[in-house]
């Protein structure tokens, strides 16, 4: 069956979203056209404005409509002296939800991956190195993902920190709260044993 050219374009555009295949894209397109044309127009307007107006923070590289994001512009965050390095803006949301961090961030927008041609400058490490040189940083917290690439990226940044005399720490990885030991994989358990802490009873 031959469908509308515009409809095919809409379905193809929807497929750029993660996890959306041909069937899902078709279902979304038909739903918008049949039941929610106003919602579709609002979606199109919001997407257009976001793609046009949202850029990157000059200091931390997260998404923002302004030159400097709200976190970097906050004087209390600046006085804290801590910078948490993460791989994506979504990681900032995760860290903020804990309520345990009150410093600033630096977003890599990825990780080192030589096989994919992604080097230090591709993830903003030249910008981070400049900040290590110029700013007084009390602690750089490395919160990259516990993957091979994430660990390699953390190690590379730790070496930069050592070069400029900036204390670097790595977030702990281990057995999840509520998890059962027998179900934990060997690598995670190894990290847990290596990063064990002394119990302070008093």
Swiss-Prot record:
Query: Where are the annotated C4-type zinc-finger regions?
Result: 57-72
* Protein name as catalogued: Recombination protein RecR
Q: Which gene encodes it?
A: recR
Give a yes or no for keyword Zinc-finger in this entry.
yes
SMART domains for this protein = TOPRIM
A molecular function annotated in GO for this UniProt entry is: zinc ion binding
InterPro entries documented for this protein: DNA_Rcmb_RecR (IPR000093), Rcmb_RecR (IPR023627), Rcmb_RecR_Znf (IPR015967), TOPRIM_dom (IPR006171), TOPRIM_RecR (IPR034137)
Annotated source species = Photobacterium profundum (strain SS9)
User: What taxonomic ancestry is recorded?
Assistant: Bacteria, Pseudomonadati, Pseudomonadota, Gammaproteobacteria, Vibrionales
Lipid biosynthesis as UniProt keyword: no
Q: Which family does it belong to?
A: Belongs to the RecR family.
Matching CDD domains: TOPRIM_recR
Report domain Toprim positions. Answer: 81-176
* PROSITE patterns assigned: RECR, TOPRIM
Reported function: May play a role in DNA repair. It seems to be involved in an RecBC-independent recombinational process of DNA repair. It may act with RecF and RecO.
HAMAP family in alphabetical order: RecR
Q: Name one GO biological process term.
A: DNA repair
- Give the record's keywords alphabetically: DNA damage, DNA recombination, DNA repair, Metal-binding, Zinc, Zinc-finger
